[in-house]
Swiss-Prot record:
Catalytic activity, as annotated: carbamoyl phosphate + L-aspartate = N-carbamoyl-L-aspartate + phosphate + H(+)
Gene Ontology cellular component list: cytosol
Protein name: Aspartate carbamoyltransferase catalytic subunit
UniProt xrefs under HAMAP family: Asp_carb_tr
Residues reported to bind carbamoyl phosphate: 58-59, 108, 136, 139, 264-265
Gene Ontology BP terms: 'de novo' pyrimidine nucleobase biosynthetic process; 'de novo' UMP biosynthetic process; amino acid metabolic process
GO MF annotations, alphabetized: amino acid binding; aspartate carbamoyltransferase activity
EC number of this enzyme: 2.1.3.2
Complexes and interactors: Heterododecamer (2C3:3R2) of six catalytic PyrB chains organized as two trimers (C3), and six regulatory PyrI chains organized as three dimers (R2).
Function: Catalyzes the condensation of carbamoyl phosphate and aspartate to form carbamoyl aspartate and inorganic phosphate, the committed step in the de novo pyrimidine nucleotide biosynthesis pathway.
Gene, per the UniProt record: pyrB
Keyword Transferase: yes
Species annotation: Desulforamulus reducens (strain ATCC BAA-1160 / DSM 100696 / MI-1)
Amino acid sequence: MFWQRKDLLGLRYLTPEEINLILDTAVPMKEIIGRKIKKTPTLRGRSMVTLFYENSTRTRSSFDLAGKFLSADTVGLTASSSSVAKGESLRDTGLTLTAMGVDVVVMRHPASGAAEYLAKCIPAAVINAGDGTHEHPTQALLDMFTIREKKGSMAGLKVVIVGDILHSRVARSNIWGLTKMGAEVRVVGPITLMPKDIEKMGVKVYHRLEDALEGADVVNVLRIQLERQQQGLFPSLREYSRLYGINQKRLELTASDAIILHPGPMNRGVEIEHQVAYGNRSFINEQVTNGVAVRMALLYLLTGGEYHALSN
């Protein structure tokens, strides 16, 4: 199979075959990361700009390293350090970058749909690095890559997503991707942090954590955004932790070989207990490594690379 899309905007409209192509391509990319010399000339002469309108540590540095490991020329821009601070529109920013010859724009933006809008405005490939509460496709892909590495096929797995589902673009992308791959997705959290009609996305909804964890194969713990407490969406961090924090006792409800994931950054002692976060069932640090591999795969595919050329 060959990659045929100009952009990666979300997982909602990707096919299972396209998802597998990305994950398959990430396998040899991870091998590159494990080398002493982490460099391949694959994207020499190609250029990538990271355009971030929101703060980021993991996603931005991950894309930057992904580009560098493939020998692409990379430039990082933030809203505060660019003409955006002077009032330049997103469209004009994109057209300016295109005029400079950029091949790929990786963008994070607070507005849902911003990546899709930019993709319609410019000929360069656009990768959505998070748009509002809409999607965060590369985070979901690295989560799925980690699950596939540890569990094999995702079909039939019971995957629990815990936390603020309402505001989480990570949750949405994971739901779209995992359900396409045949997983049983369970979402659990306070009723005030659960979207209405989320069952229509093909998930099972729980409000009691213990029920959701019963027999789970994967537990993906979302970061609780502290500002939600100020908005009155849950009483206190202590109360949230009491009801929805992942601790050793609750972990015993899951399958004996269940794995723990977290997109980071963690609020240790709130959504996840220290011993669980650093226990032998946690693959949180490996998710970070896998994120670089998945983003390398996407840069390769979106610039015309073919998987079979890597596997030969």
